[in-house]
């Protein structure tokens, strides 16, 4: 049966991780639906072509702010529905922690979402300065992180500007600072207390919670802090309890366990006479990056609706049992709000693959023993001995490598051994059955060995740092040609001079593989690949390894009537920009270039040509111009 776009949907799992925002169109190109209710589809391949006409180059980060607002609407809608179903006597406010992505367009889009209650969180003085400026009057602002006097003064000033600013005490030492600075400014603060839970959730970020967590007050510290605040006349200012179990919680059962402990703290604080009427459940709401809807670190076994139901129902039942008024619910679900809205696009610049065949060998009997064995194995076509042939061939290759290192084989002989082994492995791979348990290990080894290397125009460290740092899985697939069957498997390599500069995990149907299905790319072909769900943390965590800088980026909005609005175009960092960042003056470098061209035996025409090349080079992108 001929390959279809439905086969590509299944292969890459786009309908499992795409959350309705991404799909494969009938043309074989990826389509984006920024607002599911509008039903407007954007052909991603055509969009890249159009943006190229506006001077934007690959690699390119495309943001869809409409997705941000849809995510906020979905999140708030899930809580509103749970509140209505439970008859809960208070409201929900979604708090966006700007550390997840501090881009102005991101923050503005989130707080501009209509018909929802939205607030902001700051975890540092720079973030608080940004939040105080961007937040609309009356906005709920949560201040987390380590705090000094300046931080606390800024928060108190924010209160006077008409915001509802919660200063969350994370360390006992912050209590005295809040007392002293609130007296100096004569501002009654809104105070929150962060409790340190014993419960831990299983995730890549589980160490942000639990007893060994970096932040939060232990039971003893909580008592000490409340005693101090009451003694200082600020007991009535303690209005919020906060906890955080960790980011990307995969298993909803872990969350239930931790939340049960957290609401006990809420009851105890109320019993102390503190008017706590806000519960900030922190982060933890995950994203189904691999589409498996499981307990994998890169997935979640629940959705927004179940998450909201757990929180609202448990609070509702607990408050009813203990005669406590229902508190307002806050959550800091930044990852769930932002991950889907950004897509990284890159082009394949080169392909490296092992040979499919080897030329006929003359006088095989004159070859060295391990090479003769390889030739014999290559001619042995016994499907019952497939795994044994592989192990024997691998041993022969090891012998060849030893003999070459000892000077007993020539470079040509070593190259012949490598080609023979590659072609033999390709034949064996075709004969193996992945479904047979006895052959699965060899099948997987050969799949890895035979995968092509697709060199792509991007930097893992700059654009996808979590894939390197914590083995984060992100969905990756071709942007176009999806009506064609992909016939190759490849590992994507970046431009950096670093062996870690590659993507090691790929969503393949509903599993994670070490290579991905791709189409044949011949010399001169354009082949675009997209990495999805990069809107959370990746932009701000990216570093400048090998001095690769920011890519081109753009915001794409869908306006009423379905027309697209392109805005927020930001050009890539130039080589000059990157050198300045590491305190290398381009002006000084130009002077040095000029001096060096004069010191060499160059004629005036060559000197002028070379110097002009240096000048032009400083203005270019750090990425490849292809």
Curated annotation (Swiss-Prot):
Post-translational modification N6-(pyridoxal phosphate)lysine, affected residues: 99
Entry keyword Metal-binding: yes
First-level EC class: lyase
E.C. no: 4.1.1.19
Catalytic activity entry: L-arginine + H(+) = agmatine + CO2
Molecular functions (GO terms): arginine decarboxylase activity; metal ion binding
Any coiled-coil regions, as ranges: none
Protein name (record): Biosynthetic arginine decarboxylase
Source organism per UniProt: Chromobacterium violaceum (strain ATCC 12472 / DSM 30191 / JCM 1249 / CCUG 213 / NBRC 12614 / NCIMB 9131 / NCTC 9757 / MK)
